Amino acid sequence: MNKTAYVKQLIKTRQRQRRNTFAATLLIAGVGLIAAYKPAQAATGILNASYDVTRELFKDINPAFVADWKKKTGESISVNQSHGGSSKQARSVIDGLEASVVTMNQANDIDILADKGLLPQDWAKQFPNNSAPFYSTMVFLTRKGNPRQIANWEDLGKPGLKVIIPNPKTSGNGRYSYLAAWCSVIKNGGTEAQARQLVENLFKNVPVLDGGGRGATTTFTQREIGDVLVTFENEVQLVRQEFGDNFEVVYPKISILAESPVAVVGKVADKLGTRKVATAYLHFLYTEAGQDLIAKHYLRPRSEVAAKKYAASFRPVNLFTVDDVFGGWKQAQKKHFDDGGEFDRIYIKK
């Protein structure tokens, strides 16, 4: 082989070696990249969109559920919470808030989500007790000594009284208060005209309409506006824990059963891949541990065991339901709280 041929052969050999080395490098790098970009087992997170006065409850429920899930599955998860007026929360979910679960204080705010296709129309059949793992009722909180001598619903319509109630258009708390006052007249043998007059007199006495129950509590306790606050039973107990004997709780002769329904927001949960965790989260509310925490936060549990255990925390109350008087939440909503309904006609006269 002459010198020129030898040089050409040497160049070809070295080029082939470089190509092989480069290919091997790419292969190794590719394996490294595949390893580097292998999907990690990220912690699943769910958001619970709830109503205004359940902050403290779910601050205890959430870590208890996370620990229970970890123990059963070995998986790490997180649960976040969002709070506001019940109807505001429903609207937020409709507008894009990615809550895998909702825990509301009235069925109508979940029905609205079903009407928008975010969850099934039969959502109330997905969990026990019409998907309501706990309930409460509406009571009064007065200043120390109850100086205005408030005892029952009719007292809230007396001239000169200042009553703090959240807005029934945005808050389930406000709707329950409105309906309880209305129904107190009907259940006592009164007419619709008399019920309307009481509610009209009551709202003449409302100096400010907060958007949710917690805002109303702040107005009454910290801004010191009003003679009486109408709110959920659990909220007044929390106020008494924080402020001691500065306030008194008054139970009216009759009040309303305020159920707290829950649901998996299927469209969101399926999009995020959180349905399994979301469903387990709501089932946890019915467990012994969940019902125990519910009762400790002065919400009335469904479990007979928990109800008996915490019986001293809950005064017997003569309760009626929205179904009893109105035939259901949809009918009550349409008649009283839809635009142009009874509340609008009453409040515009104020």
Where are the model-predicted features located?
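Ligand-binding pocket segment of bilobal, Venus flytrap-like solute-binding proteins
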Residues: 188-254
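Sec-exported extracytoplasmic/periplasmic mature domains
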Residues: 62-71, 94-98, 107, 114-118, ...
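Bacterial N-terminal signal peptides that target proteins for export
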Residues: 4-25, 35-36
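Short beta-strand->loop
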Residues: 49-51, 142-144, 162-188, 202-206, ...
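C-terminal segment of classical bacterial N-terminal signal peptides
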Residues: 30-39
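Extracellular/periplasmic juxtamembrane helices and adjacent flexible linkers that interface
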Residues: 269-350
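N-terminal segment of the mature folded domain
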Residues: 42-170, 311, 318, 347-349
